[in-house]
Amino acid sequence: MSAGRQLVLEFPHRPALGKTDFLVSDCNMDAVGWIDRWPDWQGPAIAVYGPPDCGKTHLAHVWRNRSGAVLISGPELGDRAAPDILGGADSCAVDDADALSDEEALLHLYNHIAEIGGKLLLAGRHPPARWSLKLADLASRVAAAQAVEIRPPDDELLGALLVKLFYDRQLTVSKDVLVYLLARMERSFAAASAIVDALDQLGLAERRGVTVPLARTVLNELETNSDTNGED
């Protein structure tokens, strides 16, 4: 950090996670369609997968609000009993389901939900067939779930995503900044999140608005950090 930059306190921002806040495009239309189709799924579970920051967690929140399901992350499952996890609900969304802390907990949760006629939404980075599962019974159930991919964003969605991320942080940006970023940034959800976060932090540190020069600085710094991390 340069001497001219101020210390920035980390204040949490609250992303908008409602249905109307979700940005729909060709890359995620299938996933949105399955959420809208609930409860008329082909089986007890579906598995939504895609790259980091692609909206899996957002969709899980949307489905939770619509279905009354419980939302929990894979690492938080622990060895808890299925009725304890559900707490009276009949359905559950498991975010980061491919980063489990206890496979048996998910297996019991799956079986319990299927038995009581509920639904299970699994969200992860990879297709369920590629999850490293040791329990054969769990692997077969996950593999049988309807797999729904969220693909990398197109330019239209990427632009809309930048606008939403800036809005979530109450940052005002001009069209020139958006055009500059879209012409030069990596085409990924994670890159959009990293860029907006860096612009927010640097703008606060230097007490500057989000401008093209600030965007240029952030892109250069992120590229430098990426090159450094990629070195042996």
Role assignments for model-derived ranges:
Residues 136, 145, 159-172:
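Conserved AAA+ ATPase "sensor/coupling" helix adjacent to the nucleotide-binding pocket
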Residues 64-75:
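Post-Walker A helix-loop "phosphate-sensing" segment adjacent to the P-loop in P-loop NTPases
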Residues 179-183, 190-204:
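C-terminal helical "lid" of AAA+/P-loop NTPase domains
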Residues 1-37, 42, 204, 208-232:
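A short, basic N-terminal segment
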Residues 84-109, 116-125:
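Conserved P-loop NTPase "ATPase switch" module shared by AAA+ and STAND
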Residues 145-157:
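Conserved AAA+ ATPase "SRH/arginine-finger" region at the nucleotide-binding site
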Residues 128-143:
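Short regulatory helix/loop adjacent to the ATP-binding pocket of P-loop NTPases
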Residues 43-59:
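Walker A/P-loop nucleotide-binding motif
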